From Swiss-Prot:
There is a cross-link at residue 195 (Glycyl lysine isopeptide (Lys-Gly) (interchain with G-Cter in SUMO2)). Pfam families: CKAP2_C (PF15297). This is Cytoskeleton-associated protein 2-like. Its main location: cytoplasm. It comes from Bos taurus.
Length: 744
């Protein structure tokens, strides 16, 4: 159902459009919908306000004409007469055919019911539909005769009745809807013929020109099309529950009688429209105003009655629009069909057997609009869709012919539904919008969107499940791909975590090692102080032996050397060598202590006569040992090499005041004609880093020295057998080392 907010917005837009046109001076007529104007620029009749009245108190006796397509078996029916709100239906025995034939024309000037002789009331039960069709046809003939008699009576009272007091009963859709409710069968009717909501709708009396134009248009359509037998209606019909009143001048009663004459069972009107009716239509439509009766709710009650696949329309609305002054043609959205079609996609508004009494009116337009807003009927939801409009007459055709024609029309309707263009293309330019007075309701409760979306989702899920089952049956079960990315991320995270953890551990270890080394150093310092004070050597040795990793510290060996020196003679050189092997640092302090011990004159040595000779020999042995330790330092572990303090090599060049300078020996390039020069060597002073020299043994052969490098001239004489050397000056290192350098 369309929500009230939408109709309110539509009304606001219409009001603003009308104000804008009035301000611009472009409002040529009183039409509130200028976009609905026909090609002949006919003015539109004004719409009549509507209210809602009770449903149980009123009865509709005359049905509105039905817009029809140019079908083969369905012809146009008569335009209605007046209806009074005081008329009530009466029941007759079921033998009358259980069919509603309450068409009547009131000739009373005050709009009162003409009496029992002018009305044919036939009502039966709501569930029995077994009455034969012949009885129905006879009832229809009797109904038409009664209508003709009423029109004749009203024609005689033409000159005496005032214009405002004459009422013509309007055939509304209420009767059709109540018939359909009686049978619990859906009825497809255009919005222009819908029954109003009985609780909130009353009809005001419009102007006289309206009825005049409607009668003229009715005559035009009836002259244009032939009156043939309509499809028989099956089942029982429920009485009308709604009436509408439309005033009509007495001058038009003659035309109304002509309309009634045309509805005779055997009568066939001419298929050409007389020129005087066209002129009358042009004159009457010049002053006509739009009559819009707001569309109300359409509801389907499928569970109230015994049959589960029957529906009841509880309320319906009527919308009357202006007559398009153009060629009498049907709207493309109104398709042909039969009275018993069961197509699942046929919507309720697509009534194939409805007749139209106005050429190309807005009934079909609103009908198409309602079609686009109504939900689809499912298969088996309704037994049949029977043309229950009272204006459609029953002919003498048999039931078999009716069923066959209905089935054929259902097939054509299905094909036309598939090939018909979308409804919006008809509504954009010509479909009228509802005026103020109530929201437009053209669905049966819930819009299509709210019903189709869950169905689509459910259908998609079902298809997905079926596809999975098919894959499983075919053995096409897709395995889960390996989670490579996630595992990689986990590995990276673990690596990062382990890296930072390892760094933290290293820092903690360094801190602990530093604290331990500080403690050991402090302990060894205390031991030295105790030795200087003259504490017993046994106690000091016990303390030294209890210190962990004390051998890596030079102070440990210093303490041990002093303790051994206090006791007597000992092997100082062996102690020094052992300290170097253990990686004691700093080794320079230990060297100084060892030299001091060796130079002590008070020390007594066996086999030596002079202390000076012993001191010199000890010094030379210490220097040799230092050289050996330098070459063997490369064999130590990285930690030991870092902790061990390196003692620089003492060379004569350093003693001369040029530390780090060595001599590079290179052969002289071959010179043609000078063979004696080939035996000579070039000597070039170069600077070499002590750090690189210590690590050069671990370098690959490509990075090692290609030329021979010696620390002094004495080594040069020991290494090279060449007796003649040529000194070559190094421009980057201006050192001569005592060699004569020629300026040339």
């Amino acid at each position: 159902m369309v929500r009230p907010g939408l109709s309110a917005a539509a009304e606001e837009r219409q009001r603003k459009l009308q104000e804008y046109l009035a301000a611009k001076g472009k409002l040529k007529c009183q039409n509130t919908k200028p976009y609905l104007k026909a090609k002949n620029n006919c003015p539109n009749p004004p719409h009549s306000k509507s209210t809602i009245g009770p449903k149980k108190d009123v009865t509709n006796h005359v049905a509105l004409p039905v817009k029809t397509t140019r079908s083969i078996n369905i012809k146009l029916q008569s335009r209605p007469a007046n209806i009074t709100r005081s008329q009530r239906p009466k029941l007759e025995p079921p033998k009358l055919g259980k069919r509603l034939t309450s068409e009547s024309v009131s000739s009373n000037p005050n709009g009162k019911p003409p009496g029992n002789s002018q009305q044919l009331r036939g009502f039966g039960s709501s569930t029995d539909g077994k009455q034969p069709r012949k009885t129905m046809g006879s009832l229809n003939v009797q109904k038409l005769k009664t209508t003709k008699q009423q029109v004749t009576d009203q024609r005689t009272a033409k000159g005496t009745d005032p214009v405002d007091n004459t009422h013509v009963e309007n055939e509304s859709l209420g009767g059709c809807l109540k018939e359909m409710n009686k049978e619990n069968l859906p009825q497809d009717l255009p919005n222009s013929e819908r029954k109003p909501n009985p609780e909130s709708w009353t009809i005001n009396k419009p102007q006289t020109n309206q009825t005049k134009s409607s009668l003229a248009s009715t005559r035009e359509v009836l002259d244009k099309s032939s009156v043939n037998s309509a499809a028989l209606k099956e089942g029982v019909i429920k009485p009308f529950v709604e009436e509408t009143q439309i005033s009509v001048p007495p001058g038009k009663s003659q035309k109304l009688s002509r309309v009634a004459d045309l509805i005779r069972p055997g009568g066939k009107p001419p298929k050409t429209l007389p020129s005087h009716f066209v002129q009358t239509l042009n004159r009457t439509q010049a002053t006509k105003k739009t009559v819009v009766k707001d569309i109300k709710s359409i509801k389907v009650n499928r569970s109230k009655y015994e049959r589960p696949n029957e529906a009841k329309l509880q309320s319906y609305t009527v919308t009357e629009q202006k007559v398009k002054h153009s060629k009498p043609s049907t709207h493309p959205s109104v398709l042909q069909g039969g009275c018993n079609h069961r197509h699942p996609n046929i919507k309720q508004d697509h009534k194939p057997t409805q007749a139209c009494c106005r050429p190309q009116t807005s009934y079909a337009l609103q009908k198409s609009k309602a079609i686009s807003q109504r939900p689809n009927l499912t298969v088996g939801s309704f037994n049949s869709v029977i043309p229950s409009t009272p204006s459609i007459r029953a002919n003498g055709a048999t039931g078999n012919k009716c069923n066959n024609s209905c089935q054929q029309r259902a097939r054509t309707l299905d094909s036309k539904f598939k090939s018909a263009p979308p409804q919006k293309c008809f509504l954009n330019k010509t479909a009228p919008r509802t005026q103020a007075g109530g929201p437009t309701i053209s669905g049966r409760g819930v819009p299509n969107g709210a019903q189709t979306n869950p169905c689509k989702k459910i259908a998609a899920e079902d298809r997905r499940k079926q596809l999975e089952e098919w894959r499983k049956s075919k053995g096409k079960i897709y395995k889960r791909p390996p989670m490579e990315l996630k595992t990689k991320r986990k590995i990276i995270e673990e690596m990062n975590i382990s890296f930072w953890k390892s760094m933290e551990k290293e820092e903690e270890e360094k801190k602990a090692q530093l604290e331990l080394s500080n403690k050991i150093n402090n302990t060894l310092t205390e031991c030295l102080q105790l030795i200087e004070r003259g504490v017993l050597s046994n106690e000091v040795f016990a303390i030294l032996s209890s210190i962990p990793e004390a051998e890596k510290f030079a102070k440990f060996w210093i303490c041990k050397a002093k303790l051994l020196a206090s006791k007597g003679t000992f092997d100082v050189i062996g102690l020094y060598e052992e300290a170097i092997r253990n990686g004691a640092t700093p080794i320079q302090e230990l060297r100084e202590v060892v030299l001091n011990i060796l130079q002590d004159r008070n020390r007594t040595t066996e086999g030596m006569t002079s202390n000076s000779l012993v001191a010199e020999t000890n010094i030379t042995s210490i220097e040799e040992l230092a050289k050996k330790t330098e070459s063997g330092a490369s064999c130590l572990s990285p930690k030991e090499s870092e902790q061990m303090s390196v003692t620089p090599q003492i060379t004569k060049s350093e003693q001369d005041g040029h530390p780090g300078i060595k001599l590079q020996i290179a052969p002289i390039p071959r010179i043609n004609g000078m063979p004696e020069v080939q035996d000579m060597k070039l000597i070039t002073p170069v600077r070499r880093s002590a750090r690189i020299e210590r690590a050069v043994s671990r370098y690959p052969e490509m990075l090692q020295e290609h030329d021979l490098v010696v620390a002094s001239l004495n080594e040069l004489l020991e290494v090279e057998e060449t007796e003649c050397f040529i000194f070559r000056k190094n421009e980057a290192l201006p050192v001569t080392l005592g060699f004569p350098v020629s300026e040339s």
